[in-house]
Amino acid sequence: MAGISSRIFIQATVETGEGEASVTIQDAHTHIVRITENGRTVLEEPGLAGSPEDAGEATPLIHRYTLAQLREYALTVPAGEIAFIRRAFEMNLALCQAGLDSPKTTYARYLLAENGGQLISRDERATASLLCNGAIEARVLGLPQPAMSITGSGAHGIIATMPLYAAYRVQGYPEEKLLRAAALSYLVCMYIKEYSGKLSAFCGWAIAAGTGAACGLVLLRDG
């Protein structure tokens, strides 16, 4: 995957009876480099530079470490330095609850019934499925509740954290252990995403975030 490029170029033009406008996006999904209106340039910006892709030889910072080193960091970093991760669980849990409270969702309420009508049951797998899919359904429906993202994706952020939260609640693990597992989950997700880039032929939240969550679950279980 090292040769995969995430370079983006999108040009959209709209023509109406009153005129024509064109917008060009380059290098990143939100980076507008040119806007024209009736042939007149109203905005022009340079492309992005300085990424590892542009440099052609620079190694992403996270790839300077091995997976063993990332695991060691997650196990030994002072707990206070990763306490901010707690906010991810709070935010994504609130998103899931918003989905359950909304009449727009269907799958979340189905999974709630499958979990015995409880947000947290004694079934770790059913609880994880509810927390993940409930939050994701709320997100894709556009409910007015934020998701804590990782690598620029809300779905990645949900998958990287909520299975760990389910295990933590069902099995009664200490909170510090949860935070360390989440730190590893995030790092592994970032590690994989630096290989696949912004655009890839596979689903990033299934592969990158899913692998991160799996590593975090192993860490929770003293693996």
Question: What do the predicted segments below correspond to?
Answer:
Residues 1, 177-222:
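A structural-propensity feature for long, helix-poor, extended segments
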Residues 1-13, 170-176, 182-186:
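Contiguous domain-boundary segments centered on the initiation and propagation of an alpha-helix
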